[in-house]
Amino acid sequence: DISDFYNQDLTNVELVGVLDFWGRFFFHNLHSHKTFDYLNSGVLLLNMAEIKKTRLFAKVREKMSDKKMLLPDQSALNKLATEKRIAPRCYNEQYRLHPDTKIQHFTTSFRFKPYFHTLTVKPWDVERVHSVLKLHEYDDLLKQYTELKPLLKQH
């Protein structure tokens, strides 16, 4: 249940998100001297009225067209959002499933053994969700997806 996350008061807040697992170590807003403020853009609660008022998305589009960035949408949002709120990890779990996880983000991660490399497993890649991530918590949902997938191709 994510109703607490979704129904929170957004007065004077542009967006709410969870700290990026890896970005919290590498990306910081040095101009505002905030160290742990780099949000992952995979799960965001957006206050569209405030975003229109501050023109955040227009500024983000401009920044992305003017400057090359790693993770351009996420980096620009983090750099330009002036009023953001940090939500608990459980609303965008990017690393490992925990008992309190409400939303798990299937994101690219880093692996260090047997050598440094990135690992990307998409949630619809059922075989790799099982074999690589060793996740079986979503088997009921993945079974439904597998049954419905052929119907999607018909339309």
Q: Which positions does each model-derived feature cover?
A:
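Short, P/G- and charge-enriched loop/turn segments at secondary-structure junctions
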Residues: 28-34
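A glycosyltransferase accessory/donor-loop signature
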Residues: 41, 46-155
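Extracellular/periplasmic catalytic domains that process cell-envelope and extracellular macromolecules
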Residues: 9-10, 37-38, 96-98
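GT-A fold catalytic core of metal-dependent nucleotide-sugar glycosyltransferases
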Residues: 1-23, 45
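Short glycine-/acidic-enriched loop or helix-start segments at secondary-structure transitions
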Residues: 1-4, 27, 55, 114-116
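Short, surface-exposed recognition loops and adjoining beta-strand edges that mediate ligand/DNA contacts
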Residues: 23-24, 97
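Short low-complexity stretches enriched in small and charged residues
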Residues: 2-3, 34-36, 57-63
